[in-house]
Amino acid sequence: MLSPEAERVLRYLVEVEELAEAVLSDKRQIVDLDTKRNQNREGLRALQKDLSVSEDVMVCFGNMFIKMPHPKTKEMIQKDQEHLDKEIERLRSQLKVKVNRLFEAQGKPELKGFNLNPLSPDEVKALKVILKG
């Protein structure tokens, strides 16, 4: 049997390890989705370069190739890009929360500036107007 102090330390270590594993898992998933997003971007660029819109194109799904109409393929990849963007953004927002929980469990202060969001185009325009005048 472990002493109460040893059990408390063990619970603490297990909690920190679980939180760290969740952070690493999300980071890995973001990297994987970003890789897929880059591959889609390459595919869209190749479709834009190809001027023969009337022809069918070969698309790779896993380990098989399928012949599809050019416009349908482009639309499908664009929808996939939108889905990937949303999923990556969702994971990034979850990651911020998980990192803060991990820091809290370790007794470290919360990261400053970690929850900052970029300015929207409208906010940038307003800021430029204020700075000029």
Curated annotation (Swiss-Prot):
InterPro entries: PDRG1, PFD_beta-like. Keywords: Chaperone, Cytoplasm. Pfam families: Prefoldin_2. Its main location: cytoplasm. It is found in: Cytoplasm. One of its GO terms (cellular component) is prefoldin complex. GO terms for molecular function: unfolded protein binding. GO terms for biological process: protein folding. Belongs to the prefoldin subunit beta family. Component of the PAQosome complex which is responsible for the biogenesis of several protein complexes and which consists of R2TP complex members RUVBL1, RUVBL2, RPAP3 and PIH1D1, URI complex members PFDN2, PFDN6, PDRG1, UXT and URI1 as well as ASDURF, POLR2E and DNAAF10/WDR92. May play a role in chaperone-mediated protein folding. PANTHER family: P53 AND DNA DAMAGE-REGULATED PROTEIN, P53 AND DNA DAMAGE-REGULATED PROTEIN 1. This is p53 and DNA damage-regulated protein 1. It comes from Mus musculus (Mouse). The gene is Pdrg1.
